Amino acid sequence: MQEFTKVTGVAAPMPLVNIDTDMIIPKQFLKTIQRSGLGKNLFDEMRYNPDGSEIPEFVLNQPAYRDAQIIVAGDNFGCGSSREHAPWALLDFGIRCVISTSFADIFYNNCFKNGILPIVMPPEVVEVLMEDARRGANARMTVDLEAQTVTTSDGQSFPFQVDSFRRHCLMNGLDDIGLTLEKAASIDGFERDLATLRPWV
């Protein structure tokens, strides 16, 4: 999993509330088990017309936000069905952080397991960040996981809280497999001891 320590980049404003996982990655793209390649279908029905042409008004189709790494979103982001393809698609597009007043629990947990930092902040702070994001490509927002702060392009800094274990995993690029591999020597030792004690197994 890709490490997350600090990201400075363009933040895309998405004030719509209740953006669900079917909006993030529609069901017709869930047949794959590959984590790569889903970025082109992120927000598919919001980004594209039925003929495949781009909808120019959609924020990620606008030149200022095509390379966004951060999304500042409306309330209850990631609600709906528990598809892990949603964070896969966000990450494949290049999104490393989503800031909102609240997230659906399963989506929130899946983000941490896939290298994305979901940040919960009070409504008044999210509104300040949303306004900063509306300034476009000239406005660079910084998300510092080590310091646990979000800093706007004009230098306003806001603290956020994140579970210490999840913070450790993100900063060290550890998903569930990575955490298991950290214990590889102990696991190998246990298996050797078990083979000695129970050679018939």
Curated annotation (Swiss-Prot):
GO terms under cellular component: 3-isopropylmalate dehydratase complex
Molecular function via GO: 3-isopropylmalate dehydratase activity
**Enzyme Commission identifier(s):** 4.2.1.33
The main enzyme category here is lyase
Q: Which InterPro entries does the record match to this protein?
A: 3-IsopropMal_deHydase_ssu (IPR004431), Aconitase/3IPM_dehydase_swvl (IPR015928), AconitaseA/IPMdHydase_ssu_swvl (IPR000573), IPMI_Swivel (IPR033940), LeuD (IPR050075)
> Quaternary structure per UniProt?
Heterodimer of LeuC and LeuD.
Q: What is this protein called?
A: 3-isopropylmalate dehydratase small subunit
What organism is this sequence from? Cereibacter sphaeroides (strain ATCC 17023 / DSM 158 / JCM 6121 / CCUG 31486 / LMG 2827 / NBRC 12203 / NCIMB 8253 / ATH 2.4.1.) (Rhodobacter sphaeroides)
